[in-house]
């Protein structure tokens, strides 16, 4: 990374590098469904390119996405009625409920021959609500339906990539996506994202005019190579992150119960969400978060938490000590609610 930065200072930081070839080959070798890769700067870029690729490949306009999902900041990826979003921005978006195959089939029947793609995260990662895993067999059914109707299946793996399975979250859930959007952990915080796909869509992707400022900077590409190499060299990177998450979530559930609370944890252990039951206005949850922050542990108020290879069991133990103190403090603030300080 340092060499990439120094070299870039001799000219401009945003310049092509042979490292991009190395990273593309590494991604193809790592992700089960990937046969090519192209790079951008953030998740929205990768998702937007995936949509354009699907439309170019199929000659169709409409996209299916799930209610409550999030796929970036570009207007055509948002939800109807969101502030700043015009009706025309989402005129070609069809919204269905997660885990509802009948709604998917009905949407396709209502727009037969007009649907370019279906886009989804590996499982639903709601804000202010529990995560929801795919029902047994759901992804295989979705894959079969998309194939039967010539619909491109796009997996938004921006946040879950390399956490569930180094080979891709579609591999983890037992299906193959046509296009996979990567980012998040790709370069361990450096600004780079990627779109990977099947050979059948390579020409369609190549036909799309798509670029951006700083997209070809060598340093983030070098960081991505270093990150993926580190993950691949680990004996079981995803297994380790799962173990850390399981220890943390089971500990939180147990400690909360000791104080009379009910901590609900959902999602996969390496990428989980928490909330307190019987707390519809999130007051107790916010108080718990605040007490943890005071003591040095930061939890996301209403969204997912990530585990990583840098975390140790000592970190988990310290976090649970803080959580215990935080629950005690919240219980003390509500003596009439039956909690145990």
Regions found by a protein language model. Name each.
Residues 227-253:
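Structural signature of PLP-dependent enzymes
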Residues 22-120, 124, 137, 246-249:
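PLP-dependent aspartate aminotransferase-fold enzymes
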Residues 12, 173-204, 216-223:
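Active-site PLP attachment segment
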Residues 243-290, 310-311:
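Conserved PLP-binding catalytic core of the aspartate aminotransferase-like
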Residues 16-21, 188-191, 195, 208-232, ...:
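PLP-dependent aminotransferase class I/II
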Residues 232-233, 291-341:
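PLP-dependent enzyme catalytic core of the Aspartate aminotransferase-like
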Residues 131-164:
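Catalytic PLP-binding core of fold-type I/II PLP enzymes
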Residues 1-12:
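Short, small-residue-biased leader/transition segments that mark boundaries at the very start
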């Amino acid at each position: 990374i340092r060499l990439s930065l120094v070299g870039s200072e001799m000219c401009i930081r945003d310049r092509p590098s042979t490292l991009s070839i190395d990273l593309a080959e590494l991604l193809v070798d790592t992700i089960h469904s990937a046969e090519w890769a192209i790079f951008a700067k953030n998740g929205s870029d990768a998702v937007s390119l995936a949509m354009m690729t699907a439309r170019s490949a199929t000659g169709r306009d409409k996209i299916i996405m799930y209610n409550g999902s999030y796929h970036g900041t570009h207007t055509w990826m948002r939800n109807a009625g969101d502030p700043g979003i015009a009706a025309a921005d989402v005129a070609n978006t069809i919204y269905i409920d997660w885990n509802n195959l009948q709604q998917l089939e009905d949407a396709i029947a209502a727009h037969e021959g007009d649907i370019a793609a279906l886009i989804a995260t590996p499982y639903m990662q709601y804000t202010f609500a529990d995560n929801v895993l795919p029902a047994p067999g759901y992804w295989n059914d979705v894959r079969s339906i998309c194939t039967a109707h010539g619909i491109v299946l796009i997996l938004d793996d921006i946040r879950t990539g390399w956490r569930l399975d180094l080979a891709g979250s579609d591999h983890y859930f037992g299906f193959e996506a046509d296009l996979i959007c990567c980012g998040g952990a790709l370069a361990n915080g450096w600004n780079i994202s990627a779109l990977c796909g099947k050979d059948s869509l390579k020409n369609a992707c190549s036909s799309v005019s798509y670029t951006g400022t700083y997209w070809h900077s060598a340093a983030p590409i070098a960081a991505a190579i270093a990150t993926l190499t580190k993950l691949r060299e680990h004996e079981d990177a995803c297994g380790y992150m799962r173990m850390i998450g399981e220890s943390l979530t089971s500990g939180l559930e147990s400690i909360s119960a000791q104080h009379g609370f009910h901590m609900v944890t959902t999602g996969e252990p390496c990428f989980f969400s928490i909330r307190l039951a019987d707390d519809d206005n999130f007051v107790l949850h916010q108080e718990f978060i605040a007490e943890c922050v005071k003591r040095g542990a930061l939890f996301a108020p209403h969204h997912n938490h990530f585990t990583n290879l840098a975390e140790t069991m000592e970190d988990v133990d310290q976090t649970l000590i803080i959580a215990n103190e935080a629950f005690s403090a919240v219980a003390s603030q509500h003596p009439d609610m039956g909690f145990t300080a």
